[in-house]
Amino acid sequence: MDLSAAAALCLWLLSACRPRDGLEAAAVLRAAGAGPVRSPGGGGGGGRTLAQAAGAAAVPAAAVSRARAPRRAAGSGFRNGSVVPHHFMMSLYRSLAGRAPAGAVAVSSSGHGRADTITGFTDQATQDESAAETGQSFLFDVSSLNDADEVVGAELRVLRRGSPEPGPGSSTSPPLLLLSTCPGAARAPRLLYSRAAEPLVGQRWEVFDVADAMRRHRREPRPPRAFCLLLRAVTGPVRSPLALRRLGFGWPGGGGSAPEERALLVVSSRTQRKESLFREMRAQARALGAALAAQPPPDPGTGTGSPRAVTAGRRRRRTALAGTRTAQGSGGGAGRGHGRRGRSRCSRKPLHVDFKELGWDDWIIAPLDYEAYHCEGVCDFPLRSHLEPTNHAIIQTLLNSMAPDAAPASCCVPARLSPISILYIDAANNVVYKQYEDMVVEACGCR
C-alpha cells in the first residue's frame, strides 16, 4: 500500500471510528422526537420543514456537540451544536434546490446560475463608535476558497434599517454610499461602488456586486487571508462625511449584532474538478481531530461522551443500517438466497440515505436524508433494450449463457445518475451550498 492510500485509509478510520460527541447528536435528537427533513428530490423521509430543522435547537449545544465547541467563534449561533446558517443561505438553498414555497421572495442570483458552489462568509470585524462615524469596515476570512476554483460572482449583503427622520440632503439629493477596499500599508483604497442611499421604510439588505474586487484579491501573488471592504456615506456638493447610522446602518444600541444580522459575503464559484463528498469528510475529520486534541479526556461512565456510550451509539447505527439493507435486499423479489433463477432482473431499487444515521448531521444542514436508489438484479440473456447494454456486455452475457465457466455475467450498475444540492458547514465554519454530481440513480443498466 503506498503512502497516499495509507493516509486516505487513516483519515477514513478517523472519520468513522473516533469517539465523537457530535455523532451522538442523532441519538439525542431521536430521543427529543425530532424527525428527518425531506430531500429536495422528494425521496422518502420525515415531514419537517427546513425552517423547523434550522430552529431545532431544543437540545443544549454543550450536550450535543462538545467536541466541536473549540471550532466555534465566540458569540456565534448554534444549530444542534453548530453554526446557525444565515437566513439568506437557507433561502438560497430552498430556491436553487427547488424547495421554495409558492410566492416566496426570490433571492438575488449574481453569478449563481453558472456556479456549483456558493459560500457564505460572515463578517468578522468588530465595530466601535469612532469607526461608525467615519465608515463601517467588513472583514471576511476567505482562505477556505480553493485556489483552482473560478469565482463567477460575489456580493456583499449589508442590513439597513429605515430611519424615522429624513437624512441630510433629503430635500435636494440623497446621500451617496461609497464602497471601497480597505486602505493598507502598501495599497491605497480602491473605490468599487457608488450609489444613492434612497429613503427607506422598514428594512432591507443592501447588495453590492464585488466580484471584480474578489478576483483581484485572489490574483495577488500572496493574497491575505482576510478580504476587507469599507462602506462610507457622503452628502452635499462637497461630499461631507456622514455617519452611516443616520442612514440605518450599523448595530442598534452598540455591541454585536445577532448572527443573522451581520453582513454576509456570498461568493459563487465553479470547481474545475468533480467534487467528492470524501474530500469534505477528510476536511471534517482533520478539524474534528484538532478539536478532540484540545479537549480533556472524558470521564469514564455512561454519559453521552463516554467511550461506552459512543461505542453503543456506533453499534446502534450499524444495526440500523444492517436492518435497512436486509429489508431492502429481501423486498422487490430480490430473493438472494434462492439462487439465480429466483432473483429479479436488473432494475432500480430503493435506497434511503439518512445522514443522521451516518453521523453527519453535525455538519450537513440540509437535506438530512434523501432517496439515492441502487441497482440490483441479474443480467441474463437476452438483455432488454431498456437496460442499455454495451456491446461488450451483450457478448459477455451471451458467452455466460452458453458456458457459465467461460465468463461471469455482466453486472447491474447505475447507467444514469443525477445530482443533489447539499447545504453544509465546512471545516472553516462557513455555510456552503454545493451541488454534488452522481448522487441519485436514475436508471440501471448491464455493463
Swiss-Prot record:
One cellular component GO annotation, for this chain's record?
extracellular space
Q: Where is this region: Disordered?
A: 292-346
* A GO BP entry: BMP signaling pathway
* PROSITE patterns found in the cross-reference section: TGF_BETA_1, TGF_BETA_2
- Predominant location: secreted
Comp. bias intervals (Basic residues) = 337-346
Q: Which residues form the propeptide?
A: 20-318
* Keywords, sorted A to Z: Cleavage on pair of basic residues, Cytokine, Disulfide bond, Glycoprotein, Growth factor, Secreted, Signal
SS bond list: C346-C412, C375-C444, C379-C446
Q: Where in the cell is it found?
A: Secreted
Known glycosylation sites: N80
Q: Which GO terms describe its molecular function?
A: cytokine activity; growth factor activity
Q: In which tissues is it expressed?
A: Highly expressed in the primary aera of brain neocortex.
Residues making up the signal peptide according to the UniProt record: 1-19
**Functional description taken from the UniProt entry:** May play an active role in the motor area of the primate neocortex.
Subunit details: Homodimer; disulfide-linked.
Q: Which family does it belong to?
A: Belongs to the TGF-beta family.
Q: What is this protein called?
A: Growth/differentiation factor 7
Gene name, Swiss-Prot/TrEMBL: GDF7
